[in-house]
Amino acid sequence: FSETIDRNGHQAHTLIGTRLFGREDPRSHALFLLNNHIGGPGMSSLLNQELREKRGYVYTVESNVALMSDCGVWTAYFGSDHKTVDKCIRIAAAEIARLADSNLSEAKIERIKRQYIGQMQVASDHRESMAMSMGKSLAYFNEIHDIDWITERIRAVSASDLRSIAEMIHPSSWSRLTIC
């Protein structure tokens, strides 16, 4: 679907995304890694660089993954002026399509992995957050997936794994909602 809801706002809020596999799928580690590269926290994410830093089109931009037992979603959100919504969608679509069309270099993949693993290590310093994460792991998988277990799987992600995920979130599969 592609829907715009006009609420006479000063800013446009756009969500693009697609449906994916569930949380027990082994491709989830590649998905989380690629998502972090595309729109994760920090100034270096792909969409932040392209939409905010280079062009100044958005106030905020991020992408997210939500995996349930039987399915999941990948989404990207941005807040922008009304007049830049279509430009932002085209740029985001071009960036994702580029990821789906060719493998990232090994050097780029290593940088992406280091950043993601570093973010996990920083997050592990927050004991409450780690306890919640381990509790969810136990509830979902009947075992605890600690940071070492996750790091091992992130390090095993290949260029073709990332490209396969990019193909799954290709713009041709997107739905879009804009509220302005």
Predicted stretch roles:
Residues 41, 62, 66-123, 145:
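M16/insulysin-pitrilysin zinc metalloprotease superfamily fold
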